[in-house]
Amino acid sequence: MTETSKVDSSIDQNQEDIWNFAFGSNLHPEKLKGRANLKVKESFPGKLKDWRLAFNLRGISWLEPSMAGVEPAPGDEVHGVLLRMSPEEFRKLVLSEGENHAYRQVEVEVETYQGTKQKALAFSALDSRKMPEDKPPTLRYLELIRKGARLRGLAPDYISRLDSLEHFEKGPLTQLISHLLFDMMMCFGSIGKPQIASRLFRTLRWIDGSMFPRSLKWLLNITILTPALILAAILSLRHQLRPKS
């Protein structure tokens, strides 16, 4: 069966299913499943023409300064994967991406590697969260995209482009905090509660963007992060000790 017939038949079988075009960290299958425990029915690699991969979604300056989105860019293209899912699963994905506080959903037309075209929804940074210029993402975040691109079989030339991107350097303590927090995010996602971690990151982002003195910002961060990191360490340890099936 060709990819064209497979895509067309899937649409005929369920008109309510939603196609999402993943191009950032959601390229990585384990992250996609762990972040929101998503169940994807079908997936196909493809490219989005006249758009670019942008790192212009404002994050937390000291932890994750930028996240990926797509922006119009004539002559450029973004490679990624088409994901077919139910409306319920798509709502879980939206919750895991900040509950509409970070991204808007744009309708795009993606060309699969087999040449067929499919309309899909992609995430683009809200104007209120968009930075005037792109900022390099962290290596942790960028590696999720790179590994996901390889696992999904994206074009070698595009993977080379991803490999050439610069990343934001974090210190050892920040790396540890980041590792624990994102482990916690995956744990909450696996139990169907991705919004808990999203709200934590929204609070940290609000503190980061506030006009508070730096000393007060760090006091607030420590107050919030201390119990969060203890919980993250417990969840991470439980996950590591869980018997392998």
Language-model region placement:
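Glycine-aromatic micro-motifs
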Residues: T2-S245
